[in-house]
Each structure stands twice: as C-alpha cells, then as structure tokens.
UniProtKB/Swiss-Prot annotation:
Cross-referenced InterPro entries: Cop_transporter
An example Gene Ontology CC term for this record: cytoplasmic vesicle membrane
Positions in the Cytoplasmic compartment: 63-159, 204-241
Keyword Ion transport found: yes
Official protein name in the record: Copper transport protein CTR3
Molecular functions (GO terms): copper ion transmembrane transporter activity
Gene: CTR3
Ranges per topology, Lumenal: 1-41, 181-182
Length: 241
C-alpha cells in the first residue's frame, strides 16, 4: 500500500499543469513537449529568458532576410552593368575617372557567383546589427553603382534572378522564419502570462535593435543605394502565412 501510495504521489507530482485560460502558473508547467517541464522556479525563469531570446532571434532573422536580398541585388546589378561596353561610360564620365572604375567593374564581372553569395551574406550579417549612426559604411561599390547608373543611360531592362545557391539560402531563411513564427504562436496558446509578456518584450527589443532603418532615400540616385528603404507589413514572417 505504501509503495502504491508513493507511486501515485510521484505520478501526481510529474503531471503537467496546463490551462486553456489565462494563467500565471510557474511550477510544473510544460510547453510544446512533456520534456519541457518546469519543476523549479529557476527552470521557469530560464524558459522565460529562452522565449524572450527566441522572439529577438526571429526579429533579427527578418532583418537579415531583407538585407540579404538588398546586398545580393546590388552586387548582381554591378555584375550586369559590367557586361556592357565601356565606351558610353568613358564618354560621359571622363576617361580619367572611368579607367579605374572600368577595372573595378571588370573585377565584379569576373567574380564567381559563389563568392557573390558569400560576400552578400557577410555584409548582411554586419549591417543587420547596425543600430545607431550611419546605416552603412562608405563602400566603394555603393559609389560605383550610383556612378555607373548615372552614366549608362542605354541599359536594356532585364530581370535579375538569384542563382541556385542564392535561392536555396533564401528558402532556408524563410523556412526558419516560418518555423519560428509557429513555435512562438504555440507558446502564446498556453496562455501563460509570464511567457506571453516575455515574448512581447522580446518583440519590442528585437524590433528596436534590428529594424532601425531609413524611411527612404532623397536624391536623384537615391534608389540606387543598397540600404533597406522599406519596412512593409508583408515583409514580416509572422505566423499563419
């Protein structure tokens, strides 16, 4: 009888405390899986911190995805422009200035596609962490792209598509965003006040850090810049896409 009572008590203690109504449970709460069980206040505090970090990472991933598209498009534009004859560029921009620029354009044209992808990933990772001050470094390719676009007026319109590697990376990033959004949605469905507040604070912090971006660009060549100049609602990877 004592052994049976001990087993019954142990089973009762191991029960997950779940409610479909708003609650402030801390001990014996379970989230997503039975293995994610908080039997101490320390574990529950760790779960709150983890939920906070999860939402912050989701916000960073959203910014990184947009920035990767911007960096990739900028380098693809330069590589496409480098395939044109330099005659018009020399006439309109001057032979002295054009000589070094043409050599640089040739370097972009000969750049392997995998290297273009890696450089775009590197720059996206760096720029996604910019919070204060100038949004971008003063890089040669930014000035080069604006100069070439202002001098080359006879460019045939063309659609620039990502390479297979670029597309696979973009798909992978999207799947991560999509998966994180549903995990966060499931955490909200436990209606635990502490977890929901932790997620909301994570959204505030993540949005504040990673989404401080220009509202737009002013100037004739503003559209040629590689900065992120939009923050559309459709660009956020929220749940239930």
């Amino acid at each position: 009888m004592n052994m049976g009572g001990s087993s019954s008590t142990a089973a009762k203690k191991a029960t997950c405390k779940i409610s479909m109504l708003w609650n402030w449970y801390t001990i014996d709460t379970c989230f997503i899986a039975r293995s994610w069980r908080n039997d101490t206040k320390g574990k529950f505090a760790g779960s709150c911190i983890g939920c906070f970090a999860l939402v912050v990472v989701a916000q960073w991933l959203t910014r990184f995805s947009r920035q990767f598209d911007v960096e990739l498009l900028k380098r693809q534009k330069i590589k496409h422009l480098a395939s044109y004859s330099p005659e018009e560029y020399v006439v309109k921009c001057g032979e002295e200035d054009a000589k070094s620029d043409i050599e640089e354009l040739q370097g972009f044209y000969n750049e392997p596609s995998w290297k273009t992808t890696l450089i775009s990933l590197q720059k996206s990772f760096i720029y996604s962490f910019y919070v204060w001050g100038p949004r971008r470094l003063n890089e040669p390719e930014d000035d080069l792209l604006k100069k070439v676009l202002s001098c080359c007026t006879l460019i045939t319109p063309v659609d620039l598509y990502p390479t297979f590697l670029d597309h696979m990376i973009r798909v992978t990033i999207f799947v991560l965003q999509w998966g994180l959004s549903y995990i966060i949605m499931l955490l909200f469905m436990y209606y635990n006040g502490y977890i929901i507040i932790s997620c909301l604070i994570g959204a505030i912090v993540g949005r504040f850090i990673f989404c401080y971006e220009p509202l737009g660009s002013l100037g004739a060549n503003g559209s040629a810049q590689g900065t992120v100049s939009y923050d559309k609602e459709s660009d956020d990877r929220k749940c239930c896409l």
